[in-house]
Amino acid sequence: MEHVLEEFAGGKMHVDLLAVEGATYRADPPSAMRVSGKPLTEWIRAIADSADYTVAVGTCASFGGIMACGRNPMGTTGLQYYREEKGGLLGTDYRGRAGLPVVNVPGCPAHPDWIVGTLWALRANRVTEADLDRFNRPRAFYGKLAHHACPRNEYYEFKASATVYSQQGCLFENLGCKGTLCESDCNERLWLARTGSCTRGGFPCLSCTSPVFPDRFVPFFETAKISGIPTSLPLDVPKAWYVGISGLSKLACPERLRRNAVSFKPAWSGKKEPPDDGH
C-alpha cells in the first residue's frame, strides 16, 4: 500500500480523481490518523497535487460538518472550505491538474446520485467552473431548494402550519424545517429507491448540505423566532416580501387547509373529521 501511495503522491502514477470522505485537520494533533508513518493529511495534500480532480464527498469533507461544530477543539476542516470560509486543508488557491478547485458534494449523507453523477461528469470532462455554485457544489444537484416539490408546499404557501409532529401542515413556521434554506434537489430526486425524503416522512429538513450545518441550524426541532417571525427566512424570497406576504397568505388561507394543517388525517371539504380516539 505504501508503495502505491508513494507512486500517486509523487506523480509517477496518473491520478484521474481523488475522492475524500470525512473532515480533515488544519494541523495534525498527536492522535491524527497515520498511514505508513505519515499523517493522512500529508497524503491527501500530496495526492491532490497530482490528481486531475479532487472531490469532497459529504458535508464533513466539504465544509467540516459535524466534526467542526462548536468550538472545534480538534481544528477539523473541509478540504477547501471551513464552513463558509474558503481555505481548508488544501488552501484557497488549490486547483487540480484539470483546472478545477475541489468539487464539493455535501450532504449528511450525500445522495448516491450526487456522488456518482459528479464523478461521472468529471471523468467525462463535462464540468466547468461555471457549473459550480459559490461553494463549488454542482449546480445540477444543488441549484434548487429541498423545499421545491415538497408535498407540504400548499400548506407553506398559505402559512398553514403544523404545531406538533405528525400533523399535515407545513413544518417551517413552528417545527424547525430548513427546507427553504437547503440547497439540494431532495424532494425532486427523492431517496430510498425514489420513495421519500425527510419532509415526505414528516421530519424537518436540517439543511445538511449547507456549509454552516449543523451549528447555524439549531434548534433542529423547533423554529427560532423573534416577535413571532422565524429568524431564518427562505432563500428564494426577499425577506421584506416574506414578512408582508405571510400575513396576507394567512388571511387568504382556505378553511380546508387551515383545518388539515393541524389534523393528523386529511379532512376533505364537506366531510367531518372522525373523532380522535388516540389511535
Where are these regions (language model features)?
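Extended, subdomain-level signal for the structured scaffold at the beginning of enzyme domains
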Residues: 1-44
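Iron-sulfur (Fe-S) cluster-binding modules
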Residues: 1-19, 92, 96-104, 117-279
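Early transmembrane alpha-helices of polytopic membrane proteins
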Residues: 110-112
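Glycine-rich nucleotide phosphate-binding loop and flanking beta-alpha elements
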Residues: 25-26, 61-63, 212
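Class I SAM-dependent methyltransferase SAM-binding "motif I" and its flanking Rossmann-like core
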Residues: 64-98, 103, 107
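Short acidic, glycine/serine/threonine-rich loops at helix termini
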Residues: 30-31, 65-70, 116-118
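Short, conserved loop/helix-junction motifs that constitute active-site signature segments
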Residues: 45-51
